Amino acid sequence: ELMGTPDDVINLSTLYMRIYFLGMPFFMLYNYGAAVLRAVGDTKRPLMFLIAAGIINACLNMVLVIVFNLGVAGVAIATIFSQFISCVLVLRCLNKTDASYQLRFSKLKIKGYYLKQIFQVGIPAGIQSTVINFSNALLQSSVNSFGSTAMAGYTAANNILGFLYASINSVTQACMSFTSQNYGVRKFKRMDKVLIDCAILSVGASLVFGCGAYIFGDKVLMIYTNSEDVIKCGVEILSITTVPYFLCGIMDLFPGALRGMGYSLVPMILSVIGTVGMRIFWIFVIFPNHRTLYDLFISYPASWTATIIMQVICFLVVRRKVHSQINK
């Protein structure tokens, strides 16, 4: 209700949210386990587990929605069941290995030193994600003010943007992992090379997929809806956000590298100021005077650009500091 969700969809939205949040423990455990595997260079198995869960999710969606006619509840149930499967697979993988990172449930205990390090990096990153999601909720509320058609168009377009983000987020995670590994062994030149290579991959992937989504956006949106009005709204949103999406990739890359070097607080603050601050300013100051979808979503590339400038400056300062430490 606070987000201004239209009356004709609020009950379904509430039902989906309540069921979906039941699966959060599975989602979190999968991410923890997948992070361990990626940290030791195993990126294939987390991907395979996700693919398996995705296939199960798609099949369950068809069964629960089409066969059992469960609607939104069926979609939510399929989602949390697929998250449960991915969680079980990754935990089983960690439990069955003979490597140093083997998960032995009987020996699980909290170690203060490691917990402190995890909190130092994890809490700022978690706060950053939470606050950014808050700004997205404000943007969703602004979209809702256009009615259920615009809301459906945004939801469909956001699914496509989710695929784009997955491609660049994987590069960001790789950058953070490889940077932390090289930082641990004091290989400064390799850290630079990791950042450059990841930047090329991120920009290249986002430009290819972004331009593809821009050109074929209307065709892809037909997967989600047959409504011409909804597709029109979705195309308008994609036309603003897809081509400059490489800015989002660059924006995430520098904080990833900084976290790999153990610096998490400052990137969080800069991301909150650049991304969240800019979007809040845009929504409450600029958007009320120009109430169109275009003027609302142009806040995306504007906030990405502002954040990049601050993150690059921060990275250069930290890089100089780390370089001086390594040369001692």
Residue ranges, per PLM feature:
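Short alpha-helical transmembrane segments in multi-pass integral membrane proteins
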Residues: 1-23, 67-123, 179-244, 286-328
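Structural signal for membrane-spanning alpha-helices in multi-pass inner-membrane proteins
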Residues: 35, 61, 65, 90-94, ...
